[in-house]
Amino acid sequence: MMVLEKEDGVPMLSVQPKGKQKGCAGCNRKIKDRYLLKALDKYWHEDCLKCACCDCRLGEVGSTLYTKANLILCRRDYLRLFGTTGNCAACSKLIPAFEMVMRARDNVYHLDCFACQLCNQRFCVGDKFFLKNNMILCQMDYEEGQLNGSFDSQVQ
């Protein structure tokens, strides 16, 4: 049997040897096609190898599949379930890839963490805020710092 490996090491395309036909892990029918797919040490028809979340076909040439926790997933669903967008600049905790975030320059924040770091006033989309020394500040705290001579202007 010939097996071609994908980048992530998951065997994908096999040429079925003459003789005993393999059973499809998706539909449980015999695979009579010359080509079959192999993922998670199981064999699949091209049409039966699908993402466990969104049912998109993964058997097409050029498709990439991801496996984790015995699930077969497309790239989008793998990142949605298991990916991260980095760490929150305020609390330093991981931010899951599917979670909505706020951004200020190169910093990424959980929605709940996007607040003035002096008075804890939360910001909404469109609110004016200031970024000074990687600190997010509301207008009142920023202006107070300006009056005291603490800050240079860095309006976002």
Swiss-Prot record:
Protein name per UniProt: Rhombotin-1
GO cellular component terms, semicolon-separated: nucleus
Gene source species: Xenopus laevis (African clawed frog)
PROSITE patterns linked: LIM_DOMAIN_1, LIM_DOMAIN_2
InterPro entries linked: LMO_RBTN_TF (IPR050945), Znf_LIM (IPR001781)
UniProt main location, coarse: nucleus
Family matches, as SMART domains: LIM
Keyword rRNA processing: no
Function: May be involved in gene regulation within neural lineage cells potentially by direct DNA binding or by binding to other transcription factors.
Swiss-Prot/TrEMBL GO biological process terms: positive regulation of transcription by RNA polymerase II
Superkingdom in the source lineage: Eukaryota
Keywords: LIM domain, Metal-binding, Nucleus, Repeat, Zinc
GO molecular function: DNA-binding transcription factor binding; metal ion binding; transcription coactivator activity
Places the protein is found: Nucleus
Pfam families to which the protein is assigned, alphabetical: LIM
Domain LIM zinc-binding: 22-84, 86-148
